[in-house]
């Protein structure tokens, strides 16, 4: 038997705690998010300038896409961060209606039905437009 010296609820709290920096950058990403497709899809992005301002690393962005997905009425959440000039790391999460692995694989990425990602080149708006075409097809398909 292994004793960790922590009560179960204490472990959950410590595992879910974020640094002040991580909380600030998540807050900014949530504030700057945009809903589209009648609110069924949401997107947010953090550019390199913002990453540098906060002295953030990619790991500091963990959890943002999940927080976006948890918004009531959202079927698909997209979070992107700029890795290079006109290049983005894209993370997608869905609830039930969208197979984000299909979307990601079209752009050379992969993952699971509810959690997937890829790397895309182009402007932020071009990337979102390209992703949204594939997401919209799935959402419309659900309605007939």
Spans of model-derived segments:
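Hydrophobic helix-and-loop "lid/oligomerization" segment in the mid-to-C-terminal part
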Residues: 3, 8-106, 111-144
């Amino acid at each position: 038997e292994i004793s960790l010296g922590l009560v179960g609820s204490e472990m959950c709290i410590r595992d879910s705690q974020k640094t002040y920096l991580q909380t600030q950058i998540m807050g900014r990403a949530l504030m700057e998010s945009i809903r589209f497709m009648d609110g069924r899809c949401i997107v947010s992005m953090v550019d390199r300038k913002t990453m540098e301002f906060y002295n953030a690393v990619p790991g500091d962005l963990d959890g943002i896409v999940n927080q976006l997905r948890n918004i009531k009425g959202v079927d698909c959440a997209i979070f992107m961060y700029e890795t290079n000039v006109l290049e983005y790391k894209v993370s997608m999460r869905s609830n039930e209606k969208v197979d984000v692995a299909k979307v990601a694989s079209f752009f050379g990425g992969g993952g699971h039905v509810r959690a997937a990602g890829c790397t895309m080149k182009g402007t932020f708006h071009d990337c979102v437009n390209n992703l949204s075409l594939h997401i919209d097809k799935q959402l419309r398909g659900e309605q007939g």
